[in-house]
Amino acid sequence: KKQPAIGIPFAGKLIELSEQGRLPDFMVRYGIRRLCKKRLKDEFISHPEYQQDRFQKLIEELRRSPIAIDTDAANEQHYEVATDFYLASLGKRLKYSCAYYPDSNTTLDQAEEEMLALYSKRAELDNDQEILELGCGWGSLTLWMAENYPRSKITAVSNSSSQKSYIDKLCRKAGFSNVTVITADVNFLELESAQFDRVISIEMFEHIRNYRQLFERISDWLTSE
């Protein structure tokens, strides 16, 4: 049986009501199934010419875009939320990204530490490096690096003034003098050329549109070695 079409304004209203907790569970599940079905249909139309055309249009759209969009909205939704909320819901490191659980007995605090150590291993971090972290969140990796590589200099970039304040406070408390936190929109971030040995960005790329432009800037910021 063909299901009746739901107009975009009406669908938007239903989503708003569901986010407010004003719809029963069965309606929320039904709506999710409909949206997923429609998305799958749109994404997997089998005609190769259609797929290629759609892919090329997406590439061109990304190339014409700024590095990131809706940065103010992201701040409002996530990054300028009171830090006390995240202190109550995240682990000890306040890691606002994935953790690594090597086994089922691993706690959240341990999983945060495991993930931070894994970043270090994969990025080949060490002392005496200049390290840039783009999208540092509440400083889980920045503070971990400052603690484990005291002879390295770390520059952390966040678009959130409350995140900067929180990291600066913890640096003062821990006596870290090797951390600089910059509040900046990545679209307008200006840094010296050939300054950094490592550039790290953890789960920030969901906000990025123009990957090419960002990678060009990162290439300029990295040292030649």
Where are these regions (language model features)?
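Conserved SAM-binding motif I beta-strand of class I
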Residues: K153-S158
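Conserved class I S-adenosyl-L-methionine
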Residues: D128-G137
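Conserved Class I S-adenosyl-L-methionine-dependent methyltransferase catalytic core
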Residues: K38-R122, D126
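A short glycine-rich, Lys/Arg-flanked "PGG" loop and its adjoining helix->strand segment in the class I
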Residues: R212-E225
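Conserved SAM-binding loop
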Residues: I167-D168
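Conserved SAM-binding loop of SAM-dependent methyltransferases across substrates and taxa
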Residues: W138-P150
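Conserved SAM-binding strand-loop segment of SAM-dependent methyltransferases
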Residues: K173-F188
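A short acidic, Gly/Pro-enriched loop at the edge of an enzyme's catalytic core
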Residues: F188-V199
